[in-house]
Each structure stands twice: as structure tokens, then as C-alpha cells.
Amino acid sequence: MVYQKQEPKKKKAIKPYHRIKAHANPASDYNFYYPTGPESYDWTKNYPQQAMNEKKVEIADVGCGYGGLLISLSSLFPERLSVGMELRDKVVQYVEERIDKLREKHVGQFQNISVIRTNAMKYLPNYFEKGQLQKIFFLFPDPHFKKATHKRRIISPTLLSEYAYILAPGAYAYFISDVEELYLWMFEHFKNHPLFEQVERDIAENDSCIPLIVNSTEEGRKVNRIDGKKWFAVFRRITDPSKKDLTFKNYTLTSPKEIDSTTTTTTSTATITEVESK
């Protein structure tokens, strides 16, 4: 009997949606490094070419997924450092490889973005100082449909207070979902928190980040393919709750179809729906 020698199989690169869970349980204990405080984390390993600039991260994509928004932010804000924070190990590995390949292909570019594996629901203040961030994103987070798991949602009164701590006065928080119930949950929590107020409609409509949160992520494009609907909003970090305009008429931005990523306005393709204050 003759045995044929089998060639070793080549290691396949990690691809989006390939045998990777859509979400991870933030309540589970994961064995990974996290800093004891912002001063103890070495950011130079994430941004090697920015080491001498002494810049600080100003933009965070919480639950960054496969890095679609992160890569778009690199071009939109070339002078700012952006970081993606993700819990799933294989997804973080994929984003790291994706950024490395972009840096190799486009010399000198994409040096202002990076990704970290961490549990943002537990350790976000361990990475950022008070008032450090100018923008924070929560794009298509895990809905945690069961009532018993609502405590695992990325938006809650307690977590919003932590986000407010690391956001600078006037900084923006963006969130979007293709699940209306989850969107309304996030909206109500932001609206009712004393340190956040909704951004004025005309400002939100012309925000250059809006087309990105709607269409730059893999999850957003997946919703487009099935002609799904998205609900999103922008809130501002405030410092004085007593000056919050209680007569402000809240609204919701919706996207029934794709927004042109080359434009900075959503009026032609997104519908503005009034949300009555409760």
C-alpha cells in the first residue's frame, strides 16, 4: 500500500462573518490585559509613527466590529487619533491585520487608527482621562433582546455617566441601530441623562460623521442589502444640567436607503421623524 504525503494546509486569513459570533457576552470574565489607569497604558505601540507627537486619542469606536468606521475616520480626521475597542479576539486580530495591510499599501497613511481588545463596559475609564474624547460611537450594538439581559446593553444610566466622564464638554456621542426597540432604549437613556442633550437638527444633518455611521460599517452595509431601516441620533456632552433645554423637541434620523458617503448631508436620503418627549 502506498501512502501519499499530504501537503500542509495553508492558514486562511480571517474574514468578516467567517465563523465568528456576532456578539460576545460582556458579563463574562475574559483573560486579557487592561491598564490600571490611563497613565499606565503605552499608546506608542498602537501608533508607532505618532510616538513623538504626544497626541492623545480623541475618538473612540466602542464595539468597532470589523473596522469599517475606524478606517473611514482615518481619512476624515487625519490629524486626530482614533481607536476601535472590541471584545472578540478573532475580530480584533482581523482589524489589526486590516490596518497593517493598509499601512503597508499606503505608506504614511492610516497611522492614526488602531484597535484594542477590551471590555468597554468594564474598563473604558482605564484607558481615557477625564474629558479626553471629542467623539464616541456606538454603532449597531448587541440588542440583548431578552429582558433579563438588558443589563448587558452598552447604554445604561451608569455607563452614560462613565462616558460623560471621558468626554470633553461639547463632545459628541453617536449611536445607530437597525432594531427600533434598541434605538428607542438608547435614545431615552441619552435624553434623560443630565449630562447629555440632543444636538440641534441642522447641525446633525450636516455632520460629516453621519454618512459614515450609516454606511461605513459591515453591519450597516448588511442592513442595506436587505433594504432594512436604521435609526440614529447625535447627542452632546454638557456640563451644566440646569441649562438643559427641557422644551427642546427631540427628533430621530432614519435611513430607509443608502446615504451617499461623499456628501455630508442626510436630507436627500434620510427621513427626519419627530419623537415626542415623554
UniProtKB/Swiss-Prot annotation:
Residue positions annotated to bind S-adenosyl-L-methionine are G63, E86, L87, N119, A120, L139, T217, E218, E219
Its Enzyme Commission number(s) read: 2.1.1.33
Tell me the keywords, alphabetical order. Methyltransferase, Nucleus, RNA-binding, S-adenosyl-L-methionine, Transferase, tRNA processing, tRNA-binding
Q: Which SUPFAM superfamilies match?
A: S-adenosyl-L-methionine-dependent methyltransferases
Can you supply a Gene Ontology BP term from the record? tRNA methylation
Its family? Belongs to the class I-like SAM-binding methyltransferase superfamily. TrmB family.
Region called Disordered, residue ranges = 259-278
| Intracellular or extracellular location(s) | Nucleus
**Summary of the function given for this chain in its UniProt record:** Catalyzes the formation of N(7)-methylguanine at position 46 (m7G46) in tRNA.
One GO MF term attached to the UniProt entry: tRNA (guanine(46)-N7)-methyltransferase activity
User: What chemistry does it catalyse, as a reaction equation?
Assistant: guanosine(46) in tRNA + S-adenosyl-L-methionine = N(7)-methylguanosine(46) in tRNA + S-adenosyl-L-homocysteine
Q: Which NCBIfam families match?
A: tRNA (guanosine(46)-N7)-methyltransferase TrmB
Name of the molecule in the record: tRNA (guanine-N(7)-)-methyltransferase
Q: What class of enzyme is it?
A: transferase
What is its pathway? tRNA modification; N(7)-methylguanine-tRNA biosynthesis
Q: Which domain of life is it from?
A: Eukaryota
- The Low complexity compositionally biased stretches are 261-278
Tell me if Transferase is a UniProt keyword of this record: yes
Q: Name one Pfam family in it.
A: Methyltransf_4
Q: What positions constitute the catalytic site?
A: D142
A GO CC annotation given for this chain: tRNA methyltransferase complex
